Amino acid sequence: MATLVDPPNGIRNEGKHYFSMWQTLFEIDTKYMPIKPIGRGAYGVVCSSVNSDTNEKVAIKKIHNVYENRIDALRTLRELKLLRHLRHENVIALKDVMMPIHKMSFKDVYLVYELMDTDLHQIIKSSQVLSNDHCQYFLFQLLRGLKYIHSANILHRDLKPGNLLVNANCDLKICDFGLARASNTKGQFMTEYVVTRWYRAPELLLCCDNYGTSIDVWSVGCIFAELLGRKPIFQGTECLNQLKLIVNILGSQREEDLEFIDNPKAKRYIRSLPYSPGMSLSRLYPGAHVLAIDLLQKMLVFDPSKRISVSEALQHPYMAPLYDPNANPPAQVPIDLDVDEDLREEMIREMMWNEMLHYHPQASTLNTEL
């Protein structure tokens, strides 16, 4: 539970109060009353809370010492920029970003999201029975949210069950946009250690420079398979092993299906793998609906140019009971998400402060040089 504590050094900043949760100090706006910690990651701690002004339950994510690691600072800045613009019922809403007291010295960032009950990873791990209707509804919402994100010219690039938040009535929302990029960005290959390998498309594993929205479709296919089988379909131990597992299940690829590989060494590796006839997905998932298997086969295609698109997936017969072509408006404007990878800390700090001001316009009149 949350414990009210004295401020560090006994100095209380105006408009803030202080709580300890899981040995972590939260310095938060007084309108938020924390309930309990609900999650922890490399970034810090998340707690549930009530906004006493609106009586709404929210999740507060504390990102500790955000400038200690420049990559993490850039991830946070991207998330702020993106979620300020995205408005869709299958994308998590960022409600507030708390304003620090001092612009030039703040280290921690507090993000306030709508509160969800759990995530798809926890549901898949649980003993909760997942019917065909469950799988269909989760997949439909994931595709709807992704179609909207792609319409804003954005690749998510880190879709996995843990980044899909779910509430008690099975509403699903995509979260964690720290790795998202504009889909026309070139030459920004993904940093190995931050990308989740099991959901990574072949073209990323093969270090192809020219990738697009189909990388997210591959991840959706992996998530769909995990919903059907209650375990990840490709549990590789490292990059080459991941490729080997993919070929084992999909089967050895024809020469024309390797044309997209622009890295000669990577192409040689794929050709060197022992022949595999592949495995039948209907045998892997004997309880799955025949149309579910058909859609999964169209998502888990090695060659990205032959993989089904999000729009096509929504129009697949498996989605027919849920899909309404008139209920999927695109994002209003393509979002300029480009954040220079080489920004110095002072510039990241300045841009982050400006993002915070969108939620607290009155703060722009205050002295920010401290």
Curated annotation (Swiss-Prot):
Provide the species name: Arabidopsis thaliana (Mouse-ear cress)
Q: What is the official name of this protein in its record?
A: Mitogen-activated protein kinase 1
Give details on activation and inhibition: Activated by threonine and tyrosine phosphorylation.
The entry describes its oligomerization and partners as:
Interacts with MKK3.
Binding residues for ATP = I38, G39, R40, G41, A42, Y43, G44, V45, V46, K61
Which residues constitute the catalytic centre? Answer: D158
The top EC class is transferase
* UniProt cross-references to CDD domains, sorted A to Z: STKc_TEY_MAPK (cd07858)
Give the transmembrane region(s). Answer: none
GO BP annotations, alphabetical order: auxin-activated signaling pathway
User: Which of the residues bear the PTM Phosphotyrosine?
Assistant: Y193
Q: Name one GO molecular function term.
A: protein serine kinase activity
Q: Where is this motif: TXY?
A: 191-193
- Tell me, what's a Pfam family for it? Pkinase
Free-text note regarding domains: The TXY motif contains the threonine and tyrosine residues whose phosphorylation activates the MAP kinases.
* In-chain residues carrying the UniProt-annotated modification Phosphothreonine: T191, T196
Member of which family? Belongs to the protein kinase superfamily. CMGC Ser/Thr protein kinase family. MAP kinase subfamily.
Domain (Protein kinase): give its ranges.
Answer: 32-319
Q: What is its EC number?
A: 2.7.11.24
Q: What about PTM? A: Dually phosphorylated on Thr-191 and Tyr-193, which activates the enzyme. Autophosphorylated on threonine and tyrosine residues. Phosphorylated on Ser residue.
Organism ancestry? Eukaryota, Viridiplantae, Streptophyta, Embryophyta, Tracheophyta
Question: What does the record say about tissue specificity?
Answer: Highest levels in the stem. Present in the leaf, root and flower, but not in seeds.
